[in-house]
């Protein structure tokens, strides 16, 4: 009985090799096709990123709409943003006030802002932080007036006047000296954060805002309390023709707050805003024409 020995030169081996190569190539092609035709699975991180992005876009469109309808921001203004993180409202305000204006932002969580802005990290409920906001506004105003005058910035009289202004600012500054054109208040729960540079530079204050019972905004009453604190600050720090924009969680407790706003401002408009994060409904009050006779002791606070 004869036995046939298969070799590489045989036609049968070549046929098997060709069929095997075709099989491997088709398997590889089908794997590629399956990989690229099916979208990747959504992870928790990707979902959080898309949620935050949609929330930022909604906030940006909202404040731009208010600015377009009511001319909220103008060049050269001093704007105060309470609860500024992640800096959406402050960035838009800085874009409109220009280089001769100033945005002074305050929050427990730090954030990056444009060059014509000042970031003060702290709790707005602290009187020291409120004074720091006033000092930042005074410094900005003094700097603007100095730039309008033709002085040699390296001369001794000029430097001496700068030092004297800074000393007077530290010693005599009051909240009433702020004279802000616009005060915005968005004191609420922090935006969701994902792992990255932003999270690691603000990890501790972010966790404090989430867990500390004195800092966390848990319900409508906490949101109302912070809005009332912002109103008391605005009564002292706002210009007579200034604008107060306040965002507060919608609830049945807002009637007394609306009465307080009507006592302090001639014109009060209520705008509703729905967030993308927790699907919560907020009331945004646009207030103008500060009443000079308004006193904090007459309010329902």
From Swiss-Prot:
Keyword Transferase found: yes
Its EC number(s): 2.1.1.-
MF (Gene Ontology): rRNA (uridine-2'-O-)-methyltransferase activity
Chain residues that bind S-adenosyl-L-methionine: 87, 89, 107, 186
Reactions mediated catalytically: a uridine in rRNA + S-adenosyl-L-methionine = a 2'-O-methyluridine in rRNA + S-adenosyl-L-homocysteine + H(+)
Active site: 247
Gene Ontology CC: mitochondrion
SUPFAM superfamilies found in the cross-reference section: S-adenosyl-L-methionine-dependent methyltransferases
Sorted UniProt keywords: Methyltransferase, rRNA processing, S-adenosyl-L-methionine, Transferase
Single Gene Ontology BP annotation: RNA methylation
InterPro entries in the record: RNA_methyltr_RlmE, RNA_MeTrfase_FtsJ_dom, SAM-dependent_MTases_sf
Family to which the UniProt record says this protein belongs: Belongs to the class I-like SAM-binding methyltransferase superfamily. RNA methyltransferase RlmE family.
Protein's name in the database: Putative ribosomal RNA methyltransferase PB17E12.10c
Gene source species: Schizosaccharomyces pombe (strain 972 / ATCC 24843)
